[in-house]
Amino acid sequence: VSTEQDSQDPLEQRTEAVAFDPFADDEDDAEPGTEAVAFDPFADDEDWDDGWDSDGETDYSAMGEMAGLLKDLDKLRKGGNREDPSQRSRQLALDTFRERRGTRRATRVVADGMVELPWVEPTEPKEALIDPEPAVVKKGIAPPVLHPGDVVASQYEIMGVIAHGGMGWIYLAQDHHVAGRVVVLKGLHSTDNPDEAAAAAAEREFLAEMTHPGIVQIFNFIDDPRVPGGFTVMEYVGGPSLRAWRNASTSKVLQPDIAIAYMLEVLPALDYLHSRGVVYNDLKPDNIIVTEDQVKLIDMGAVSGIGAYGFIYGTKGFQAPEVATEGPSVASDVYTVGRTLASLVVDLPQTDGVYEQGLPSPIDEPLFRQYTSLYRLLARCCNEDPAKRFTNLVELEAQLLGVLREIVAVRDGRTYPAQHSLFSPQRTTFGTKHLVFRTDQLIDGIARSVDITPQEVVAALPSPLVNRDDVGAAMLQGSSYAEPRETLETLRQAMTTPQYEHSIEIPFGVVRTMIDLGLTTQARSWLRSLSERFGDNWRYSWYAGVVETLLGDFASAKGSFSQVLNQLPGEAAPKLALAAVSELILQEGGYQSSALLHDELSPAAAGLTQHLRDVPDAVFERMAADGATDNTWSLTVTAPEGLRFHATRLYALVWMTNPTTVSSAFGLARMLMCENEVDLAIKALDKVPNASRHYRMAQLTAILCLVAEGATEDHIRLAARRLEQIPSTEPRFLQIKVAVIEAGLTYLRAHQASTNVALFEYPFTVRGLRRGLAQTLRDQARVAPYPKHRYALVDLANKVRPATWF
């Protein structure tokens, strides 16, 4: 039957769906397609027809009694008892897979590329077995109930024991239902009474639902009359524990960057548990297994709900002290993270094999002197008050990464971007031009100060970034490009809207806008109104420090910024603020040009050629006795020596970690110049990269540092060579040249020259340099902007010019 569709042009047919069967033939009469055939490498390529019947068997009917024997021989010849070739091939592949496991010895790069974790040799199951007899004899532990060869639940054959934990012996077994897979059998909570039985049932329920790559996988739960509570069957993780890995090192501790990297690998698993409403409770190096390609948490027996009560399992020396009275919480897990990390990097004091509470101070522990940010992070994690610890593991992770950046920068000189910072980059600079600007008096006759001011410090400090999870974040980001007055009006309207009543960022946005408008007193009043609600928030302390700095209350500002640093030890912003405020206090006290530190302390604090861990403990003990510091290296000290020490140390730390924060380089140079460490000051300034727009200013400042009061001949000549490398088109070339020649004259009036090599193009004599100074002053007068100052420069040139007959 003809239809309308049949009459249409085939090229104009509509697109329509057809059933797709990848295994169906395209055409019934198509040629044979690709198909699987059985491959037997032992089979003959062709069948011989000679002497064979149609079934491939020889007719032995005429052989009489020999027929049966010959048929049996035929079966053997044909391979009737040979192993199936496909099974043999699969077994060969499996053996090869197992044999090559762990042969690729590659390190792993983690922590945003900052750390390369070393290769870890996988541990074969049989190597993990231990002899229980020593523990039974020495510690009085009950012997294992199960022995090698015992079968549990008609499935798991016991291979032996690998450890003894809070739930008894931990067994290694083979799962005969899953190709002999090696598993671990660990005891569950006892079920002697109904309450314990209910707890055990609940434990099984949430353990069964844990699915995270960083947590050991649970396979099964089994009951066995020999073990009350039964067993958890979990995967075997072949690798050493962090405790064994630490003890295998020669120093019995891990390098701090390696330890932090391992903890960063553990945090996602812990955070997963917290997101499911449970806490781990028993984090310690023994329960963290390092494999060839990942880190895993084992021993889920202590996991409990947040705020649970009853028997809460943990390990003394690691468990938070409030667990017994307040129950487990996220804060108690944060405590165990801090204790675990501390036990990996330092030798914590012990009593009867149990770690004592608290941390060694930087005075007692050289590692904490070198990496004070690590000490502050551990101190916050292990604070006795749970409310003062990190509120969650995401916050802790960000600060761990910041601390790791510092450690890598200080130890190896490698810098990485601050990808997780809570602050913006430095908005501008402070203290970068003062020393050079002082020589501008030769241009216009106007005297200038070399002191930094609170206003320029505050203008340069980084700003807190808006928390994107805050309800008012979108509104604040939308108003960031408006004028401050418009922004203030927008914020006022937002605060009257119920939608934003729970916002934290909007009230602080009001403070920030008031500061930008110069309404410092009003900003302080507004902050005071927020103290009850947000007093524990680090943003409150930050803005309080900013306001106090602008109002000249430097001691209070120091306390506020110290609180920020204690809460955010991995951030550079509070360190820069504290260094600047310490310098402002020294300026206010008239100590800006006085040497205050022990001879060994300045180079070590700068970290350019020495480290604080190399300074004898006696130096810091004396400082503590003099009140210049304390055991915790508190940054609220007011003694001039302590102010100089911390300012130098913090400027250096910020500069080494953040090479774009050039204010810290100039600040470090100023502190070192006060301590007469000229060479170190030059070294700090020389680290300003060529690509920086502050590079030329750093070079000019270095020249002026070389010719500062008390300059040696070597420094003066070095300053001249440095200036000659700068193009003469530099606007300040002549005035810097005047400073160098003048320093040479001052030196020659008190010392004898060691050589007659010229300085610039002038003989290195009093007469030669006087002539050179007069000539340079005349050159400077030609570019002076004001006639009066031009005449003054010419008069000065005439005064210093040596007397001549013509």
Model regions and ranges:
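Conserved N-lobe loop of protein kinases adjacent to the ATP-binding glycine-rich P-loop
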Residues: 164, 174-182
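Conserved N-lobe ATP-binding subsite of Hanks-type protein kinase domains
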Residues: 169
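AlphaC helix of the eukaryotic protein kinase fold
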Residues: 189-209
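A short, aromatic-enriched beta-strand patch in the conserved N-lobe beta-sheet
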Residues: 220-222
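Conserved short submotifs of the Hanks-type protein kinase catalytic core
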Residues: 226-241
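Activation segment signature within eukaryotic-like protein kinase domains
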Residues: 262-263
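Catalytic-loop of the protein kinase fold
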Residues: 274-290
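Regulatory extensions appended to serine/threonine kinase catalytic cores
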Residues: 410-510
